[in-house]
Structure formats: structure tokens, C-alpha cells
């Protein structure tokens, strides 16, 4: 716990080092993050239930098909939200940013840049939610845990390293890289679990045939 708090303090220190306007813009986009993620969260809950029910019924083929359709719907939804954010995001961000002349204008620039980055890679986040939920529905908690650790490592590493190389723009990519880090664990993990389920069903069928 102590090391985690130390890392969080270090990350916050990096954010704070870019000044008040950057902090305000960064925080404004983070507040909007919940809106970007809301559909992904809902899809995730649905996929946990769907996967669990079909697993219990022994319909593993439906899990594979449902995951494919779920990912497709999630990605399409993310594209729609991305389009909406590019059209109306600047106006929405204005609700979270102070109207103070100089700093307000600078904060708006940072917030808009950050929002465009996150929106452009929103499909990565939606895949994360859906695949993680399917794995949880299969009864596996280790893979989602490991993905969370990778997500944390990527976010922290990017926050501490990228600003040194690319300035304030570097820190704006930390969240997106964290999503990618999680997906790098979840997608192979899902493929492994799917193969394991299909293999188990095949073995069960062989036993029943022998009987």
C-alpha cells in the first residue's frame, strides 16, 4: 500500500509540474471520462451475465459468438461516441472549466487536446471492458487481476517517462497506453480461456461417446 501511494504521489507531482492551467484542463477531461465509459460499463455487466448463463448451460459456442458480437457493438458504439465528442466535446468541456480569461483559455486547449486523444482510442477501452467481463463470466479472476496490474504499470510508467521525452503531451497518452496494456493481457487471456473451454467440451463429448 505504501509503495502504491508513493507512486500515486509521484504521478500527481508530474501532473502538477505543468501548472494550474494544465491541471484544470486535465481534470476537466477526466471528469468527462465517466460519460465516455458509461456504455462500456453497461456492456460489461451484460457480458458477465450472458457468459455465465451460457457457460452454465454448456453452450460454449454461444460465448464465442456473443463475444464477437459484443466486441463489434462496443467498437461501433465507441466510434459513435468519438464522433459526438469531436463535434460537441469542446462545448461540453466548457461546463467543467472556469471562465477566467487567461488560465481558462489555456485549460480549454489542454482539455480539448486530451479529449481528442482519449476519444480517438476509445475503441481500445470498449474492447477492454467487454473482453474482461467475458473472462470474469467464465469464472476466471486471475487474468483480469493481471490485466489490472499491467494497466497500472503502463499508466504509471507512461506518466513518469513520456513527459520527459515529449513534455505535457506525453502525459496525455498515459491513459490510452494503460488501456492498451490491459488489452495485451486480456485478449490472449480470452483466447486461452476459450480454447480451454472448447477442449473441455471435446473431452466431455469423448467420455459420453465411450459410455
Residue spans for each PLM region:
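Helix-terminus/linker motif at the lipid-water interface of multi-pass membrane proteins
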Residues: 7-35, 53, 93-102, 164-165
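Small-residue-rich hydrophobic transmembrane alpha-helices
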Residues: 25-89, 125-147
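Short runs within selected transmembrane alpha-helices of multi-pass transporters and secretion channels
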Residues: 44, 118-137, 143-158, 171-187
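Short alpha-helical transmembrane segments in multi-pass integral membrane proteins
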Residues: 51-120, 162-211
Amino acid at each position: 500500500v505504501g509503495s502504491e501511494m508513493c507512486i500515486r504521489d509521484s504521478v500527481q507531482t508530474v501532473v502538477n509540474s505543468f501548472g494550474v492551467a494544465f491541471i484544470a484542463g486535465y481534470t476537466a477531461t477526466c471528469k468527462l471520462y465517466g460519460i465516455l465509459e458509461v456504455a462500456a460499463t453497461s456492456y460489461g455487466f451484460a457480458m458477465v451475465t450472458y457468459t455465465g448463463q451460457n457457460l452454465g448451460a454448456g453452450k460454449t459456442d454461444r460465448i464465442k459468438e456473443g463475444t464477437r458480437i459484443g466486441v463489434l457493438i462496443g467498437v461501433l458504439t465507441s466510434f459513435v461516441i468519438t464522433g459526438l465528442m469531436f463535434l460537441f466535446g469542446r462545448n461540453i468541456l466548457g461546463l467543467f472549466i472556469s471562465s477566467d480569461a487567461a488560465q481558462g483559455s489555456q485549460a480549454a486547449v489542454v482539455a480539448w487536446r486530451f479529449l481528442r486523444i482519449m476519444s480517438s482510442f476509445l475503441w481500445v477501452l470498449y474492447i477492454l471492458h467487454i473482453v474482461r467481463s467475458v473472462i470474469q463470466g467464465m469464472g476466471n479472476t486471475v487474468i483480469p487481476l493481471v490485466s489490472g496490474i499491467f494497466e497500472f504499470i503502463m499508466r504509471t510508467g507512461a506518466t513518469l517517462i513520456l513527459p520527459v521525452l515529449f513534455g505535457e503531451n506525453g502525459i496525455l497518452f498515459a491513459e490510452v497506453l494503460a488501456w492498451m496494456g490491459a488489452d495485451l493481457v486480456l485478449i490472449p487471456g480470452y483466447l486461452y480461456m476459450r480454447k480451454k473451454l472448447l477442449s473441455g467440451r471435446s473431452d466431455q463429448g469423448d467420455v459420453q461417446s465411450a459410455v
